[in-house]
Amino acid sequence: MADSALTPGFSCYLKNLFAAHHLDIAVLGCYLNLATPDQAVLEKNVHRYMAHIRMASLLGAGVVGTETGAVNESYSFEERNHSEEALDIFIKNVRPVVQYAEKMGVILAIEPVYKHIVCNPKRARKVLDEIGSPNLQIIFDPVNLLDISNYKERESIIAEAIEVLGEDIAVIHIKDFIVKDGALVSVAVGTGEMDYTQIIRFIKEKKPYIHTTLENTTPENAVQAKAYIQKLYDTCQIK
């Protein structure tokens, strides 16, 4: 759909449709590469982010969500994604998008992913601090911070994310993972190796009613996944 099709009328139609079913629009996704070396593509991507931000302001969406890109045109992993140069490129290119979000009263939320430029909590913290805007926040997807090289340290990685980013977490993605053929494969929560106790406690203690969305479910396991995480929430004891 063209950016020009994201009109106020279309936005109001969708807002009313969701409201009629008592549904929030938690995240309006715009997952494009803000670090592409192709300047023409970058300009097009920035324009599309701004169109989504305008639409989000009319939809009443919680956030416009994005990941943080790669230093190549294919949006694929390479070691340079984890360099300081790559982080500087992303910060430079996301800054005008955040400034536009400020004008429109919308939150842009970045999602750290191990294979992308913002690959860990410390790099995410640096982006937040460099930009210095309350309109830039975090989508916390714990599985996306993991890789075959670090998944056994997931409890400490999650703890670090909560400590370093907790105040700025606006949305939480809930999924699970299994190890298959030497790689992590994302699956529905409750069907893999993740322990969500630490995250559920964080939600209950610090983030009441935060938008928390299930990922990697199927029609066959979606209800079971919701029941699994709901039970963890209901039985979690906090002081």
What are these regions (language model features)?
Residues 28, 91-193:
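Acidic/histidine-rich catalytic cores of soluble enzymes
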Residues 26-28, 64, 172, 212:
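Hydrophobic residues within beta-strands of alpha/beta enzymes
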Residues 1-10, 33-39, 72-78, 115-120, ...:
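Acidic-and-aromatic substrate-binding clefts and catalytic sites of carbohydrate-active enzymes
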Residues 12, 17-20, 36-138:
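Active-site acidic/histidine proton-transfer and metal-coordination neighborhood
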Residues 68, 176, 216:
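Short secondary-structure boundary segments
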Residues 189-192, 198-206, 210-213:
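H/E-rich (His + Asp/Glu) clusters that bind or coordinate divalent metals
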Residues 222-239:
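C-terminal helical cap(s) of enzyme catalytic domains, especially alpha/beta-barrels
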Residues 23, 56, 61, 169, ...:
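A structural motif
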